[in-house]
């Protein structure tokens, strides 16, 4: 644990964001709690559990928690519309052939309506955000594709013999953030060119804005997570630790001015930053 803490300490050398406050969201803290996402406007958080079963909407203004779905698999890779009024999630089902499939569901959180928009999908990661979007990133079967104006383009900046995970499109849709298993985090242009290494321990990365990345730096003993810190990275190489060393802080999500994450103990926290 000491070695891991030293690694984080050495990385955290630059001032990128000012941490204004760190507060537990008690209404969003429960056994096995995990953050599934934060709305683009930062007004609510989606919660799930460690096995990604179900989604609950936690209103940051009122503290009210509302059940969206109890579906299995719903908490993995949730997509938001740009105004945050709609989300797209998966519900895992078993077909008559006894095989496992995903139904893709669109939920209107304002009208509290849901509809299945694709049935019996076998591609675990392929979700398309609702709304009028011309460029969409699809991270499926550890590969990346860009769908631009209806045309699907395969992208492999580090080659085809590696696994791509945690892929996301920058807010301005000009860059792709992704993690290559066993290698680290990278950013490239939407055509797959100009790949830039961000960091080996920049795991579960998320865009904070077009220039800053939020991630976790987790260290384990081969079996269990020992330490984990929420980090900020810039595209020009700066690194900052955002959480205290006594927290095992994991899987962050960010909106402008806010970072949310959960701990191994099921506590959910809101970091307000500027």
Q: Can you say where each PLM-predicted feature lies in the sequence?
A:
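N-terminal signal peptide c-region/cleavage motif recognized by signal peptidases
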Residues: 9-11
């Amino acid at each position: 644990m000491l070695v891991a803490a030293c690694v984080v300490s050495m990385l955290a050398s630059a001032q990128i964001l000012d941490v204004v406050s760190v507060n537990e969201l008690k209404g969003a803290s429960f056994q096995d709690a995990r953050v599934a996402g934060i709305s683009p406007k930062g007004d609510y958080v989606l919660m799930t559990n460690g096995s990604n079963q179900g989604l609950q909407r936690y209103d940051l203004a009122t503290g009210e928690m509302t059940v969206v779905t109890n579906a299995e698999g719903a908490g993995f890779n949730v997509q938001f519309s740009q105004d945050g009024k709609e989300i797209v999630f998966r519900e895992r089902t078993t077909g008559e052939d006894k095989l496992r499939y995903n139904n893709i569901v669109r939920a209107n959180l304002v009208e509290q309506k849901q509809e299945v928009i694709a049935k019996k999908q076998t591609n675990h990661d392929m979700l398309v955000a609702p709304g009028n979007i011309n460029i969409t990133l699809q991270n499926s079967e550890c590969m990346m594709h860009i769908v631009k104006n209806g045309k699907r383009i395969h992208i492999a900046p580090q080659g085809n013999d590696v696994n791509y995970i945690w892929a996301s499109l920058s807010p301005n849709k000009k860059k792709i953030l992704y993690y290559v298993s066993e290698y680290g985090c990278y950013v490239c242009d939407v055509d797959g060119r100009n790949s830039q290494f961000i960091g080996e321990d920049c795991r579960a990365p998320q865009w904070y804005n077009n220039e800053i990345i939020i991630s976790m730096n987790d260290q384990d003993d081969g079996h269990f997570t020992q330490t984990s810190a929420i980090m900020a990275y810039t595209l020009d190489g700066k690194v900052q630790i955002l959480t205290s060393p006594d927290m095992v802080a994991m899987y962050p999500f960010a909106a402008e001015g806010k970072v949310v994450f959960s701990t191994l103990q099921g506590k959910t926290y809101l970091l307000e930053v500027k």
